[in-house]
């Protein structure tokens, strides 16, 4: 039972790190990346649909995204959705594809993005710590019910703490990498 609690905690922590990585993909770091458009939803015949389900997105150059809609009639709606998103990008279309030129970031914008990276990082760490707390509470219940001994409880909480430390170290490494990418000129 205690091993199960630890396994569940590990899986939840892994998911928290994955969610954090996905959040960071949406932060524009001055170079093109299909993940930038992940959160853009298009009003497609009255249904909010993610843009990556309506078009193929490619990165032919470092600062250019090309969006090729499967349905050409949706181009105008896609343009509206991109303009409405807070990406700060201006689409240009030639009737069959939408091109997004990614301008170089200003120093001020870089600092804002670095702050945002730190905020996401802190949120992810809080999520991991909450998972640790929940796992430790579960283990304490098991000890209280007599399913594990006090020594086993200590051993298992140490294991949960090690998991927490590992995941927080992962988050720190990812954060450092993304901050470096954002601050790069």
Curated annotation (Swiss-Prot):
Gene3D superfamilies: 3.30.1360.40, Ribosome-recycling factor (1.10.132.20)
Transmembrane segments: none
A GO term from the CC aspect: cytoplasm
Alphabetical list of SUPFAM superfamilies matching this protein: Ribosome recycling factor, RRF
InterPro entries, A to Z: Ribosome_recyc_fac, Ribosome_recyc_fac_dom, RRF_sf
Keyword line: Cytoplasm, Protein biosynthesis
Principal subcellular localisation of the protein: cytoplasm
Keyword Protein biosynthesis: yes
Pfam families according to UniProt: RRF
GO BP annotations, alphabetical order: translational termination
Location in the cell: Cytoplasm
A molecular-function term among this protein's GO annotations: ribosomal large subunit binding
Classification via NCBIfam families: frr
Protein family according to the UniProt entry: Belongs to the RRF family.
Reported function: Responsible for the release of ribosomes from messenger RNA at the termination of protein biosynthesis. May increase the efficiency of translation by recycling ribosomes from one round of translation to another.
Name recorded for this polypeptide: Ribosome-recycling factor
Gene: frr
């Amino acid at each position: 039972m205690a091993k199960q609690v630890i396994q569940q905690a590990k899986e939840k922590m892994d998911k928290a790190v994955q969610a954090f990585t996905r959040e960071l993909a949406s932060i524009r770091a001055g170079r093109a990346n299909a993940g930038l458009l992940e959160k853009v939803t298009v009003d497609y015949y009255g249904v909010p649909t993610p843009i990556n389900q309506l078009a193929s997105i490619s990165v032919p150059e470092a600062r250019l995204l090309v969006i090729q809609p499967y349905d050409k009639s949706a181009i105008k709606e896609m343009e509206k959705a991109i303009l409405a998103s807070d990406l700060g990008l201006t689409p240009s279309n030639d009737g069959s594809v939408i091109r997004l030129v990614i301008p170089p970031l200003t120093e001020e914008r870089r600092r804002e993005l670095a702050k945002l990276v730190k905020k996401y990082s802190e949120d992810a760490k809080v999520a991991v710590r909450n998972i640790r707390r929940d796992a430790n509470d579960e283990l304490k219940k098991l000890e209280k019910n007599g399913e594990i001994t006090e020594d086993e409880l200590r051993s298992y909480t140490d294991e949960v703490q090690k998991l927490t430390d590992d995941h927080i170290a992962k988050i720190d490494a990812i954060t450092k990498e993304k901050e470096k990418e954002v601050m790069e000129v």
